[in-house]
């Protein structure tokens, strides 16, 4: 009775939610939603966008740099210059201090520079493109991780729902048996002990049902979390459990497995390209740099602050030129930077080798785990079929008076355990199948 009330409550709540237009998701739709709304995935995409803007930032250094400057000077003490005394009739070798200038000086101008040659600039621009590729690979890996997490969470909900459905069927069947046994007991055709045994079995099954209902609710929350969906809003699933493809040992061969298909390996390769360009950047830092410089300004000098007097003159100033910078000695700083960059490349080479070995081992382990999971699933499915046959036969014998309630309870428990074993094996097989696809680099976005 408790199970029926609880199930009715679930149906009532479901209908209430349905009136609020519950959003229904297929697995494909759930994955697409997660790829758009997952906060962690959005952050990796923002990292990619930041890398793109970094390229624009570095590129801007090679474009003309134009600035406007305004300089106002007030000389509290006008600068003094020493003029040879013979200009004023003084003895040769003497100097006379004379102040030149006026207190107020205002200069307004525009300066411009253009980088003509700098080896570090061109290499740095290529390096930022490599960093952009690196962040894009990381973004792709995050998408695969999101697909994996959502797929597993979706399947977990389907399987926990299936287990809940099976438990509900068991409860209904056991409740019917319990009611019939109670009638037989009251009529004097069954012992009280038989009825009590069935009641204990029913209560235990009710407890399992309650636990399964809580696990189903938790599975829904986990799915919504992986999707980036609001936890306080209900959802419904439209897909059913997919059939696992029949995979034989030959079809699980790793003969054509290539670690380079994995995004983790591609990320390290992109990192290597960035490190190579970083080394090149330090090496070309020994080359000179050449910059074109120019300035155009106008200047006014006044005894008083009357720069807005249009009747007084302003004097133009203009120049163009080149600035050549040749590195001579920096205390071996660039030599140390080159050595560090080479060592980073060696580390990357070791990382590539280690990752190749690790990915190969992961693929082999995924193959073994999948084979074992499929074998276990076949066994558990057969056990479930046998347990169901035993239960149906035992129930018929009990109705005919050829078997006791003890045998009925035992058959019911065996069937319940077989159901649990089957659903657990089913979840494991689906989860391991996803891991196998990921290990071989076969997991992709739904079309």
Positions of PLM-derived features:
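Sec/SRP-type N-terminal targeting helices
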Residues: 42-46, 59-60, 103, 116-143, ...
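Small/polar, glycine/serine/threonine/aspartate-rich low-complexity segments that form flexible
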Residues: 20-22, 69-110, 240-248, 293-326, ...
